[in-house]
A protein has these predicted regions:
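Hydrophobic h-region of N-terminal signal peptides that target proteins for export
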Residues: 7-19
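Bacterial N-terminal signal peptides that target proteins for export
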Residues: 1-6
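N-terminal, motif-rich segments that launch catalysis or mediate targeting to/interaction with membranes
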Residues: 20-136, 143-270
Length: 270
């Protein structure tokens, strides 16, 4: 089969970065995205799992989950699609203000879902939409991707975290979990076990907007609301918010599976 230029680019970038063995807080960290994808895979129907494997040409969802970050250096058209700037004091999502021209994560998820569900969409378009969707569903559940306090989602909110200088976004992108020294397999096993005690059908309820507003509330109450005076974040903040991160990763995986099961229900290999 002749590989198109788009297919070649997708393939090169899909496999360009090897899986990391330790956590890094550079973004909603790579292993966080991988864990979301692995949790989602547990909830896929066999039909959906086969469809995903076909669309990704055998690549795992975990490996596909980091593609959208790996292409940032040359795909600047997608930069604004990783987040939505809902003001911290807002009580509702207003698309005309917070997602002009559909340039936000909420609209991007819906577009990618539609491409996946479209039987007329090309294989390349479906592969790109799936890689974006896997990643964006992870980003949506990082609370600081859903809120803005005139500080670029916490990137300009300087804090000290367990004695070192950083910013609030990095804390929530991975440093909260990094501080425990956990490895991917142990953390995945822990979260998988936690799923047995959670009402997963309840997590599936709602819309993408509902889930973004849920993340916004967490940003208000937990991410910003628990910062000690002076911005010196210590163990008490970690202890209070580690369960929040755990729950968000589980929710992201469960909801990603729901979206994929629905979007690919009618998928037929070509």
């Amino acid at each position: 089969m002749t590989m198109t230029l788009t297919s070649l680019i997708l393939a090169l970038w899909a496999y360009a970065a090897p899986a990391r063995e330790t956590l890094t807080a550079a973004r909603w960290w790579d292993l966080g995205h991988r864990i979301v994808a692995r949790l989602a895979d547990l909830r896929l129907t066999q039909h959906t799992r086969d469809a995903v494997r076909d669309i990704l040409d055998g690549q795992s969802m975990a490996d596909a989950s980091v593609w959208a970050d790996n292409i940032k250096n040359y795909r600047h058209d997608a930069d604004a699609l990783h987040y939505v700037n809902i003001p911290l004091r807002a009580t509702a999502y207003v698309p005309s203000r917070q997602c002009p021209n559909g340039r936000c994560i909420i609209a991007a998820i819906e577009r990618d879902r539609q491409v996946l569900a479209d039987p007329k969409a090309s294989r390349d378009d479906r592969a790109e939409a799936l890689r974006f969707l896997i990643h964006f569903m992870g980003d949506l559940h990082q609370p600081l991707h859903d809120a803005n306090n005139n500080d670029r989602g916490g990137n300009q909110r300087l804090v000290t975290f367990l004695g070192h200088d950083t910013n609030l976004h990095k804390v929530w992108d991975g440093e909260l979990i990094d501080s425990s020294g956990v490895d991917q397999e142990s953390y995945f096993a822990f979260l998988r076990g936690r799923m047995d005690s959670i009402d997963l059908p309840a997590l599936e309820r709602g819309t993408v907007v509902d889930w973004a507003m849920e993340g916004h509330r967490i940003a208000v109450e937990d991410a910003y609301g628990r910062i000690p005076r002076g911005g010196h974040i210590g163990r008490a903040y970690v202890a209070a918010n580690r369960p929040v991160i755990d729950r968000q990763l589980i929710a992201a995986g469960v909801r990603l599976a729901k979206v994929l099961n629905e979007a690919l229900a009618g998928y037929r290999p070509r």
